[in-house]
């Protein structure tokens, strides 16, 4: 009995499908549109029951929604100012105004955005304490356990100015006693006689001048150093004078006629002005006969 029931249910299903979608048997022209309209109406009612239909004029991409942009210019300027301030601060700003063609109220003007911290007005209204940089911003970023003196680094010490590097005299230094003219003359005469004194001579000489042995000893040491400096300066002068000097003709100086410089200049001029395959221009020679006074040698010398 079970196979018979299955066989009878199959033709019934096919019949229903054919009756719903296939053409009628009569094939009349006036009958097909009515059936199609009935089918479309039935499907539309099912979709409307499942999803509410939105008017075409309220869609975001409709012509009415695109042409219904009635926002005030003040709202645009506030949004632009806020976006520019946010871009300068490195943050992202989302527009709070109503988008054109939104489902809310397309014709309602968008309310101006309140001034934030990143807008120009917000920056101008901030107190001066907020605009001034904190003295130590690292303290704000630290956790409580880092702010404890045990874990926090010691405060930076201010560097004191460097101490004076000049040599300081001893506190117990004796004041300098100036020598009299008679003592200086006697010391100078004794130094010319003998630069080094023995202990006995120094004791006798210091007692005759009413000076201590230390004062006489130090004066002789300073006088020997001065004599050494003077001697080195004299030797340097002698070395400078002994070095050969440059010929005066090299500096273009003129001498009287018949002098050695005139002969050397004439020989050089004849040498360079001689005719040959590679002829050179004659060197300029100072007029010899214009100056009759003898010019001294220069102080320049060859090293």
Swiss-Prot record:
Changing residue 15 to R: Abolishes sumoylation. No effect on interaction with PIAS1. Pfam families: Homeodomain. One of its GO terms (molecular function) is DNA-binding transcription activator activity, RNA polymerase II-specific. Gene3D superfamilies: Homeodomain-like. Sumoylated by PIAS1, desumoylated by SENP1. Sumoylation of Lys-15 and Lys-133 not required for interaction with H1-5, transcriptional repression, inhibition of myoblast differentiation, or binding to gene promoters. The keyword Flavoprotein does not apply. Keywords: Developmental protein, DNA-binding, Homeobox, Isopeptide bond, Nucleus, Repressor, Transcription, Transcription regulation, Ubl conjugation. There is a cross-link at residues 15, 133 (Glycyl lysine isopeptide (Lys-Gly) (interchain with G-Cter in SUMO)). Acts as a transcriptional repressor. Capable of transcription autoinactivation. Binds to the consensus sequence 5'-C/GTAAT-3' in downstream activin regulatory elements (DARE) in the gene promoter, thereby repressing the transcription of CGA/alpha-GSU and GNRHR. Represses transcription of myoblast differentiation factors. Binds to core enhancer regions in target gene promoters of myoblast differentiation factors with binding specificity facilitated by interaction with PIAS1. This is Homeobox protein MSX-1. The lineage of its organism: Eukaryota, Metazoa, Chordata, Craniata, Vertebrata. The gene is Msx1.
């Amino acid at each position: 009995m079970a196979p018979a029931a299955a066989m009878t249910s199959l033709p019934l299903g096919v019949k229903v499908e054919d009756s719903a979608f296939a053409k009628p048997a009569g094939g009349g022209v006036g009958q097909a549109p009515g059936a199609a309209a009935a089918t479309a109406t039935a499907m539309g009612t099912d979709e409307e029951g499942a999803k509410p239909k939105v008017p075409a004029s309220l869609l975001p991409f409709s012509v009415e929604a695109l042409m219904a942009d009635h926002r005030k210019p003040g709202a645009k300027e506030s949004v632009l100012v806020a976006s520019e301030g946010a871009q300068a601060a490195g943050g992202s700003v989302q527009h709070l105004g109503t988008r054109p063609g939104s489902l809310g109220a397309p014709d309602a003007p968008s309310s101006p955005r309140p001034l934030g911290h990143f807008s120009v007005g917000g920056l101008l209204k901030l107190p001066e304490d907020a605009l001034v940089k904190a003295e130590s911003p690292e303290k704000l970023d630290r956790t409580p356990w880092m702010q404890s003196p045990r874990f926090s680094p010691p405060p930076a010490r201010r560097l004191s100015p460097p101490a004076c590097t000049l040599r300081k005299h001893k506190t117990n230094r004796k004041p300098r006693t100036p020598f009299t003219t008679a003592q200086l003359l006697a010391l100078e005469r004794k130094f010319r006689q003998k630069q080094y004194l023995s202990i006995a001579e120094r004791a006798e000489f210091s007692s005759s001048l009413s000076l201590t042995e230390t004062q006489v000893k130090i004066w002789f040491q300073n006088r020997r150093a001065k004599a050494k400096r003077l001697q080195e300066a004299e030797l340097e002068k002698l070395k400078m004078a002994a070095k050969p000097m440059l010929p005066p003709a090299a500096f273009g100086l003129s001498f009287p006629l018949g002098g050695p410089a005139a002969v050397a200049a004439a020989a050089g001029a004849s040498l360079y002005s001689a005719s040959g395959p590679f002829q050179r221009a004659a060197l300029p020679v100072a007029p010899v006969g214009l100056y009759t006074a003898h010019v001294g040698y220069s102080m320049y010398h060859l090293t």
